[in-house]
Amino acid sequence: MLTDNSQIRIIYVLLDGVGDLPHPDIENKTPLQAAKTPNMDKLAKNGKMGEVISVGKGIAPESDIAVFNMLGYKFHHTDYAGRGVIEAIGTGLDFKDGDLALRGNFSTLDEKNVIIDRRAGRHIEREDAKAVSKEIEQKLKFSNPLASVVVVPTIGHRVIVRIRDEHPLSPNITNTDPAYSRVDGMGVAKAVGDFLKIERCLPLEDTDVAKLSADLVNEFTEKSLKILKESVINKKRKSQGKKLLNSILLRDAGNKYPKVETINEKYSMNFSCIVDMPVEIGISNVLEMRAYSAGGLTDYEEKATVAAKSMETENAI
């Protein structure tokens, strides 16, 4: 049932990462500059121009916190659940307050444990990702027998890791992924060079629970490296000349389900969304938006059709 704002209709398109950088293969233009975009050009000419600072000046936020901000949700570091939790929710993973959820990348290390590909080739066969995840789950045993881990591959190189212990765990720990730091509880990309290695997870506060959480993450990293080194799947990939899935870079820890005002309550309108990625599904679940799927990642015509159709019953998509 539509609200008092029933006449309002909004199709809200977020072009995540569209800015990009100039590239020599396209005459040092950005992909957006090089592309033929007559419809976007017309919208721009007839629209209003401005700058939106979604998180903070000079901060390149990850998609989760950026989307929340663009939808009007401003988190302080004590409030935000962490992207690991958002993606865990988006995958339907069994997660409860006190669990530690982290997002990660399958990555490739050389024989000196230097990261040579942060995404292990990026396009990873679903079967391989599922198989190595299952190997880790079956073979990894923490020193505390009451601790356990679940590893869920999502899309391409992406993976979710959930660690559960007899005690509630803390998100106040550093990333093992050297390309991302934590600023006020949010993941922020760092300017990094080559020859990076997996970083040791450290507690961000002097508490037993933060130290325990960091220790469990480090134990996961150390033991999963050994399992992946002997992995049947990696031996097969090596024989096929493919990038090895021989490490997981972890970041954005969280330990609680986010509690926020639903988006329909916030704006007194009916909201829906078109989602593809686990982080988008997680955001829609947290904000209680009706979610539509519309083809694959690049099926834009189908997405436009679904968006137009949704305007019959929704205020915004």
Predicted regions and their residues:
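Anion-binding catalytic surfaces of enzymes that hydrolyze or transfer phosphate/sulfate esters
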Residues: 247-317
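Active-site nucleophile/metal-coordination loop of metallo-enzymes that catalyze phosphate/sulfate
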Residues: 2-7, 19-148, 156, 160-162
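Beta-strand elements within well-structured catalytic alpha/beta cores of enzymes
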Residues: 8-21, 42-43, 237, 245-249, ...
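Hydrophobic alpha-helical scaffolding
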Residues: 8, 122, 210, 214, ...
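Generic recognition of stable, solvent-exposed alpha-helical segments in well-folded globular domains
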Residues: 13, 35-38, 131, 215, ...
